[in-house]
């Protein structure tokens, strides 16, 4: 297995379907030009905003999954700048799940953020996604906030989590 930092083009080519599934699930219409343009723009803008996509591949080059995070290291000489990072999205192709690969990717994110001056890492997950919450809790993240109704008034919302690096 190889872990590399993907550029935007490679990320879109290899993980577009995973991102669409994470962000919009079955609400995404593959025939709707507005949907396609919106996703591509959202990915592009996110890459422009100091994000990094760490992507895992098999030795044969088959995509496994990714952790996409933002760490703005800030202005040189400004003490509070660059101390936090945020996981934007992460996902593994189903056949590669529950093999320790997600943990390896998360550890690599933590190491990179810390080596670049980061002191803490945040993430958020849908409250109904117990597997995701347990993944992070088992790896040292602490739930710190609940934002109900984030995806609509009848939605359970997001749980925000924090880990000191």
Predicted regions: what is each one?
Residues 6-89, 93-95:
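Acetyl-CoA-dependent GNAT
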Residues 122-125, 137-158:
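Conserved catalytic-core motifs of GNAT/GCN5-like acyltransferases
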Residues 162-165:
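Short beta-strand-to-coil "C-cap" segments at the C-terminal boundary of structured domains/repeats
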Residues 1-2:
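Extreme N-terminal starter segment of soluble prokaryotic enzymes
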Residues 102, 106, 129-132, 149-155:
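Short glycine/proline-centered loop/turn elements that form peptide/ligand docking sites
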Residues 92, 98-111, 134-138:
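Conserved acetyl-CoA-binding loop-helix of GNAT-fold acetyltransferases
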Residues 113-125:
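Conserved GNAT acetyl-CoA-binding A-motif
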């Amino acid at each position: 297995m190889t872990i590399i930092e993907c550029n935007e083009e490679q990320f879109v080519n290899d993980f577009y379907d995973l991102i669409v599934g994470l962000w919009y699930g079955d609400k995404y219409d593959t025939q709707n030009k507005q949907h396609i343009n919106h996703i591509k723009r959202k990915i592009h803008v996110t890459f422009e905003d100091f994000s990094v996509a760490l992507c895992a591949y098999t030795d044969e080059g088959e995509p496994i999954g990714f952790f996409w995070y933002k760490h703005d290291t800030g202005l040189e000489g400004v003490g509070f700048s660059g101390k936090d990072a945020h996981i934007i999205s992460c996902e593994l192709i189903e056949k590669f799940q529950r093999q320790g690969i997600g943990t390896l990717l998360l550890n690599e994110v933590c190491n990179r953020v810390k080596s670049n001056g980061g002191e803490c890492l945040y993430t958020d997950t849908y409250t109904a996604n117990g597997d995701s919450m347990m993944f992070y809790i088992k790896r040292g993240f602490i739930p710190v906030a609940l934002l109900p109704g984030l995806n609509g008034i009848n939605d359970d919302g997001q749980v925000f989590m924090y880990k000191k690096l």
